[in-house]
């Protein structure tokens, strides 16, 4: 990328909204009583993704698991198709491999920059062309429509590590990775998720349009298009197009996202808040284009970078900053360095380089 373009993108940092916590005078006593997850957040329009420390699981045995056999069978078949796709990769044309990488990155951004940082957390704002791109990319990813994805994710933050958390990591690696999609939702997930304020997404026509036409959209964008393009445009075999460009690519995107829910809640350091389960996991960040700095993200869910370090192993932040340089993204929320360091000192596990 040309140096002047990098300079333009870097200078666009000055347009971010810096979030600080400046208690002084009589306010100091008030701040002591404010839950840590609320102290630094100044977003008046979004509170549904902030952890609720008052919520506790009800005592008693958990409900019996109800398996969703349709999901189990489809998930097994998909992963078998993905494994077969790995075997076929050496026989693929170079264009097919490059197209698969492009489709992976685009659909991943539909989750990370779209469903996650834009629509779940409102960490930045996007103009219509960017929102259209992200809604298409999100449909390519096929991980439920934006509305449902954001509702589950807000519940995950607000009721993290409880039965109201859709992919509660306290129930083990397999459950938080994929098992939660193979069983009926816990009653607490339905109850608490149904009470979340989703009015911001209900008011967004593009999100509701995607929700209304999601099934035909996902069939076209996730399965039909990535199969037909290599087959028709450069003469790839239909089998390679189907199993590599479609099944393998889709399987990889799914598992990269799921690792944020599983591995990044079980393995890694907790430099920002040792009292929560989410961890910093560099390997997860590599696959999930920047989503592995999870202890930071759960500590500061309102930071558009989902990380203290902006572009470091964080392609999603680089993408958002490029969009800002083009005038398509704006009002990016960024936690101040002073606030981050203060939080590290208060609740970190001592693993941060500043400790």
UniProtKB/Swiss-Prot annotation:
Induction: Up-regulated by agonists that activate NR1H3. Up-regulated by a high-carbohydrate diet. Up-regulated by a fat-free, high-carbohydrate diet. Down-regulated by a high-carbohydrate diet enriched in unsaturated fatty acids. Up-regulated by a diet containing high levels of stearate. Its cofactor is Fe(2+). Substrate binds at residues 71, 144, 151-152, 184-185, 258. The keyword Magnesium does not apply. Residues 1-68, 115-213, 260-355 are cytoplasmic. Residues 9-20 have a biased composition (Low complexity). Fe cation 1 binds at residues 116, 121, 153, 157, 297. One of its GO terms (molecular function) is palmitoyl-CoA 9-desaturase activity. A motif (Histidine box-1) lies at residues 116-121. Keywords: Disease variant, Endoplasmic reticulum, Fatty acid biosynthesis, Fatty acid metabolism, Iron, Lipid biosynthesis, Lipid metabolism, Membrane, Metal-binding, Microsome, Oxidoreductase, Transmembrane, Transmembrane helix. Expected to bind 2 Fe(2+) ions per subunit, instead of the Zn(2+) ions seen in the 3D-structure. Residues 9-33 are annotated as: Disordered. It is a multi-pass membrane protein. Pfam families: FA_desaturase. One of its GO terms (biological process) is response to fatty acid. Fe cation 2 binds at residues 156, 265, 294, 298. It catalyses: octadecanoyl-CoA + 2 Fe(II)-[cytochrome b5] + O2 + 2 H(+) = (9Z)-octadecenoyl-CoA + 2 Fe(III)-[cytochrome b5] + 2 H2O. Stearoyl-CoA desaturase that utilizes O(2) and electrons from reduced cytochrome b5 to introduce the first double bond into saturated fatty acyl-CoA substrates. Catalyzes the insertion of a cis double bond at the Delta-9 position into fatty acyl-CoA substrates including palmitoyl-CoA and stearoyl-CoA. Gives rise to a mixture of 16:1 and 18:1 unsaturated fatty acids. Plays an important role in lipid biosynthesis. Plays an important role in regulating the expression of genes that are involved in lipogenesis and in regulating mitochondrial fatty acid oxidation. It is linked to Defects is Scd1 are the cause of asebia (ab). The trait is due to spontaneous autosomal recessive mutations that give rise to deletions or point mutations in Scd1. The ab trait has complete penetrance. Ab mice are characterized by reduced body weight, extreme sebaceous gland hypoplasia leading to nearly complete absence of sebaceous glands, and thickened, scaly skin with hyperkeratosis and alopecia. The hair follicles are abnormally long and extend at a sharp angle into the subcutis, probably due to abnormal persistence of inner root sheath. This is Acyl-CoA desaturase 1. It comes from Mus musculus. The lineage of its organism: Eukaryota, Metazoa, Chordata, Craniata, Vertebrata.
């Amino acid at each position: 990328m040309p140096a002047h373009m990098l300079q333009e993108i870097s200078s666009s940092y000055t347009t971010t909204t810096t979030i600080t916590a400046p208690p002084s005078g009589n306010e100091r006593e008030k701040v002591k009583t404010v839950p840590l997850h609320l102290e630094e957040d100044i977003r008046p329009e979004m509170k549904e993704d902030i952890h609720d420390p008052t919520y506790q699981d009800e005592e008693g045995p958990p409900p019996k698991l109800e398996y969703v056999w349709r999901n189990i069978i489809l998930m097994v078949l998909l992963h078998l198709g993905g494994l077969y796709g790995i075997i076929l990769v050496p026989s693929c044309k170079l264009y097919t491999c490059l197209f698969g990488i492009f489709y992976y990155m685009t659909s991943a951004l539909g989750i990370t920059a779209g469903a996650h940082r834009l629509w779940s957390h409102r960490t930045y704002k996007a103009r219509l062309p960017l929102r259209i791109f992200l809604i298409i990319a999100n449909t390519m990813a096929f991980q439920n429509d934006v509305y449902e994805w954001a509702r589950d994710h807000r519940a995950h933050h607000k009721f993290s590590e409880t039965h109201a958390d859709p992919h509660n990591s306290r129930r083990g690696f397999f459950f938080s990775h994929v098992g939660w999609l193979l069983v009926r939702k816990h009653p607490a997930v339905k109850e608490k998720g149904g009470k979340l304020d989703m009015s911001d997404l209900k008011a967004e026509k593009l999100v509701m349009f995607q929700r209304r036409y999601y099934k035909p959209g996902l069939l076209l964008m996730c399965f039909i298009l990535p199969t037909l393009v290599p087959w028709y445009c450069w003469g790839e075999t239909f089998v390679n197009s189907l199993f590599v460009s479609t099944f393998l690519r889709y399987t990889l995107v799914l598992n990269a996202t799921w690792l944020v829910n599983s591995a990044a809640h079980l393995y890694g350091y907790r430099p920002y808040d040792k009292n929560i389960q989410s961890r910093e996991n560099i390997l997860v960040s590599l696959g999930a284009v920047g989503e592995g700095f999870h202890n930071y993200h759960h500590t500061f869910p309102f930071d558009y970078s989902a990380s203290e370090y902006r572009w470091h192993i964080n392609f999603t932040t680089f993408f958002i900053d490029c969009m800002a340089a083009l005038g398509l993204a704006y009002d990016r929320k960024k936690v101040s360095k002073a606030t981050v360091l203060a939080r590290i000192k208060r609740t970190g596990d001592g693993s941060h380089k500043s400790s």
